[in-house]
Amino acid sequence: MTTLFIVGTDTEVGKTVVTSALAAYWQTYHSSESLGVIKLLQTGIGDVEHYQRLLPHVEVVNPLRYETPVAPPVAAEKENRSIPLDQVWQGLNDLQQRKNLVLAEGLGGLGSPVTWELTVADLAGEWGLPTVLVVPVKLGAIAQTVANVALARQYKVNLKGIIFSCPRPLSHEEIVNFAPITLIESLTKTPVLGMISYLENIEDITKLAHIASSLDLEMLF
């Protein structure tokens, strides 16, 4: 059984695209091996519904959800609810017992709050989850990557590598300038597993699988 925790430097950076691409690849090239997708916590509507449409024959789990689309501690306070992380852990553990691969998507960024005391980095480190960091290709990507890798090290996260994701159409020159792989690997001492180009339709499973096949997947599976 393999578990990958997909985290980002921030919200809306491509975590769902990367998770979808990895799921599409597994469904296409490892169809005989079971797959589970879990959104550990969700606020508002979005990711879970996307996975259910994209992967109708895959078990998609969301152990904890709030209606208000803000950070979980704020959402829980607004809805007069608690944040039972044991429920989240149990949902993940149950899925791990039954699947060959579990793709777990985080929320927000690595430093985003999960409770009033804990961040996504705390969960990744304390739960020992092999983690992939998704970084958007834009001006400032180098600093974001360095800062988040440092945060991962501080919390003893098992960081397997970095995947860059293009949030909009970019030229080759822009990609090279915004996310110079050699420089980033030198600064972070962490492998860059590849680049996810901009996709207008993130529910095209064939394109998603093709894009994922260009990543250095031997580092993950």
From Swiss-Prot:
Mg(2+) binds at residues 16, 47, 105. Pathway: Cofactor biosynthesis; biotin biosynthesis; biotin from 7,8-diaminononanoate: step 1/2. Transmembrane segments: none annotated. InterPro entries: DTB_synth_BioD (IPR004472), P-loop_NTPase (IPR027417). It is found in: Cytoplasm. It catalyses: (7R,8S)-7,8-diammoniononanoate + CO2 + ATP = (4R,5S)-dethiobiotin + ADP + phosphate + 3 H(+); (7R,8S)-8-amino-7-(carboxyamino)nonanoate + ATP = (4R,5S)-dethiobiotin + ADP + phosphate + H(+). Its EC number is 6.3.3.3. ATP binds at residues 12-17, 47, 105-108, 165-166. GO terms for cellular component: cytosol. Catalyzes a mechanistically unusual reaction, the ATP-dependent insertion of CO2 between the N7 and N8 nitrogen atoms of 7,8-diaminopelargonic acid (DAPA, also called 7,8-diammoniononanoate) to form a ureido ring. This cyanobacterium does not encode bioA (which catalyzes the formation of the precursor for this reaction in the cannonical pathway), instead it encodes bioU, which replaces bioA and also performs the first half of the cannonical BioD reaction. Thus in this organism BioD has a different substrate. This is ATP-dependent dethiobiotin synthetase BioD.
